[in-house]
């Protein structure tokens, strides 16, 4: 079975690469993103819209309400193995994402060492200026999407249920928006009415939070196997 793995830090274009590859191959894309398993966080987690998918198929490891929390890495890994098994007859899958913990689970599991032909695309972290430009563009789109609720609208809706707030504080984007509101002594719903200057500061802050996370991803991702080449067989990751 062919597995095409696309991974790298946030805001480096993995989803676009996966969609383009899905168009070329006709294979479905399975998201290796634990936060994207919560549809209530669709915009803030970077779930592509139906239009952005361009007729391709995108699968998720779970479909759960936020009240259940973010799926644990070990459970997500079990779901990943099950989905790969389910699609074995289709001849292949595209795996795309940047969950450090899930990729580490893959690296530590012997399951991936046999019976697969690997095609790996590793997106690297660019310099800070290039990254921030891309991250700010992404945040602007999240704050004013063409379709669906904005990141702030998702936050405001979920904020109304106090038991969800600790979960939101653990998620990039939502966490900074909550901090920004607190620092400026406003309620989350007032984030929907910011002037251009304040919105610019919010965008910059969220992008900076993404940069911090991207640097952590770049540092903690398991390394690609030294034996990696197009269509190689064996473990996809090396020792770390």
UniProtKB/Swiss-Prot annotation:
The lineage of its organism: Bacteria, Pseudomonadati, Pseudomonadota, Alphaproteobacteria, Hyphomicrobiales. Transmembrane segments: none annotated. It comes from the Bacteria. This is Adenylate dimethylallyltransferase. SUPFAM superfamilies: P-loop containing nucleoside triphosphate hydrolases. Gene3D superfamilies: Crystal structure of tRNA isopentenylpyrophosphate transferase (bh2366) domain (1.10.287.890), P-loop containing nucleotide triphosphate hydrolases (3.40.50.300). The keyword Signal does not apply. One of its GO terms (molecular function) is AMP dimethylallyltransferase activity. GO terms for biological process: cytokinin biosynthetic process. It comes from Agrobacterium vitis (Rhizobium vitis). Its EC number is 2.5.1.27. It catalyses: dimethylallyl diphosphate + AMP = N(6)-(dimethylallyl)adenosine 5'-phosphate + diphosphate. Transfers dimethylallyl groups to AMP as part of the biosynthesis of cytokinin phytohormones. Keywords: Crown gall tumor, Cytokinin biosynthesis, Plasmid, Transferase. The keyword Magnesium does not apply. Belongs to the isopentenyl transferase family. Pfam families: IPT.
């Amino acid at each position: 079975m062919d597995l095409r793995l696309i991974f790298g830090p946030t805001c480096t274009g993995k989803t676009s690469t996966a969609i383009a590859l899905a168009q070329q191959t006709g294979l479905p894309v399975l998201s290796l993103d634990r936060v994207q398993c919560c549809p209530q966080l669709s915009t803030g987690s970077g779930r592509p819209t139906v239009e952005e998918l361009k007729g391709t198929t995108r699968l998720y490891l779970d479909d759960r309400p936020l009240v259940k929390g973010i799926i644990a890495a070990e459970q997500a890994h079990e779901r990943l193995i099950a989905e790969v098994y389910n699609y074995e007859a289709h001849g292949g899958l595209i795996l795309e994402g940047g969950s450090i913990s899930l990729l580490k689970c893959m690296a530590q599991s012997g399951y991936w060492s046999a019976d697969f032909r690997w095609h790996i695309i590793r997106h690297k972290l660019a310099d800070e200026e290039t990254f921030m430009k891309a991250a700010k563009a992404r945040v602007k789109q999240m704050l004013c999407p063409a379709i669906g609720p904005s990141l702030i609208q998702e936050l405001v809706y979920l904020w109304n249920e106090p038991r969800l707030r600790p979960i939101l504080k653990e998620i990039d984007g939502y966490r900074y928006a909550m901090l920004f509101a607190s620092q400026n002594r406003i309620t989350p719903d007032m984030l929907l009415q910011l002037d251009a200057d304040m919105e610019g500061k919010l965008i910059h802050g969220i992008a900076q939070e993404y940069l911090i996370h991207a640097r952590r991803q770049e540092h903690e991702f398991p390394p690609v196997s030294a034996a990696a080449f197009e269509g190689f067989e064996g473990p996809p990751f090396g020792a770390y």
